[in-house]
């Protein structure tokens, strides 16, 4: 069997056509935008996998058009001999000649069966497939038997259910019928995804196929173990109820990548000549063996001339080289943003559509990319697979580990081109640059105030909601932000960590120290545009400007009196509370504010004089 498989591969039996699905222009219009994106992603990924396995010699026209962002139906083939001069080179299968294609309006069951028998492809149980109203399902046989796959390409513009048999004459009005002969494992073996995961561990095609298969089983139970393409197709394409325009499409090609899996599955029917000691996989043909072997050997023969980075295949090198030349051929029609790879464009377009097809089965949170879902699920599992070798701290994402390691190396690769300040994270640079641009993209829906950081907006909104989630464990006082709580703690501890280098005066808050330093320099950068008075900090200017505007936003809840400054309100509230924290050392009198105490102390000073 292994010899026969290698012979089949050498004759071109395993090609891109085995893992591709064509749509006519009319059929393409039935697809939703998200399904078109999925189609593009899967077709390009299938081609990459073929390249990786060494099974693709020349790039198909379909791939070229998909890479250019064009519609795939532009490469719709006319399957009759008269409409395709280069038919034999397209199908790439020497055993199949154009006489296999029957370009007639109607063809009877007997005629098709007669042609099958004439080519030695008679299957006694194949006739049973004709009983199911043209739903040409994958027909199960054992691994040693021939398997007939029927793909019908038909016109849908008439709105007729062309693939149904009429009761009289049992005729099949098909545009054309293409019959290919393959050897495949049983359906039970096809469902052993763990085998395929060894060969394609990160393949999104497998992931999507598993999902669809699970959904199908939940709908139909275990009554039938054969694949029902029409079930998948009707669900995924959004066909109106009662119509079955594509019943005979082999839609599983799009998601199962079955031809390559069939080749790998052959390892379970006998000893094969090429095997790996590293992973236990065996391959029936040398081209299967040599390409995956590069994973274990680390061989990367294709090196970039610009940066020296190496790749296992020239296809991946070509994609990488776009980073140097700046080529971004895939452009978003919504915002004109361009990308180097079509897969990146498809992911980006979900921002505009809002599509989040990957949902967490633990909490229901949905994501636009499968990779984001995998990272999120580690929150539930507690898995942190990325560990720092320096301090053994573990992380859920490799990107977080890379960022953390810069603490140890001191690397700050992101530099501001305005002031030269460098940062260890790109997001930190992006946020910093808003200081120079004045950009404040986060707006409060209550008062319209804008902020440069989302965290600042969140803190501000607590003014409107009254939320104060941070509590002092010493006195029970609550604060809106953790920084306010930290500053408050220093009242209890007496800590003043911020010291002026000029006069030695210490402060509990860094901002107060900054304002203090301006008193030494005489710097007053904040000037009132009404009277020209200047101030050392912006908050002083804001308070001053209320004199001109008459604004008094701070109102006493006891008597209704309003004030320009919040400090004035606090001093006033001590009158209602009877609080007098400032005591005269001479006579023992108490006062509600320090200015009242100072006025009082002048009396004692005059008495001594």
Curated annotation (Swiss-Prot):
One MF term in the entry's GO annotations: DNA-binding transcription factor activity, RNA polymerase II-specific
This protein's UniProt keywords: DNA-binding, Metal-binding, Nucleus, Repeat, Transcription, Transcription regulation, Zinc, Zinc-finger
Cell location: Nucleus
Top-level taxon of the source organism: Eukaryota
Zinc finger (C2H2-type): 274-296, 302-324, 330-352, 358-380, 386-408, 414-436, 442-464, 470-492, 498-520, 526-548, 554-576, 582-604
PROSITE patterns with a match to the protein in the record: KRAB (PS50805), ZINC_FINGER_C2H2_1 (PS00028), ZINC_FINGER_C2H2_2 (PS50157)
Pfam families: KRAB, zf-C2H2, zf-H2C2_2
UniProt key word Zinc-finger: yes
Record-annotated KRAB domain positions: 14-123
BP-aspect Gene Ontology terms: regulation of transcription by RNA polymerase II
Cellular component GO terms held in the UniProt record: nucleus
Keyword hit for Electron transport: no
InterPro entries, sorted: KRAB (IPR001909), KRAB_dom_sf (IPR036051), Znf_C2H2_sf (IPR036236), Znf_C2H2_type (IPR013087)
Function: May be involved in transcriptional regulation.
Family: Belongs to the krueppel C2H2-type zinc-finger protein family.
Protein name, entry field: Zinc finger protein 527
Gene: ZNF527
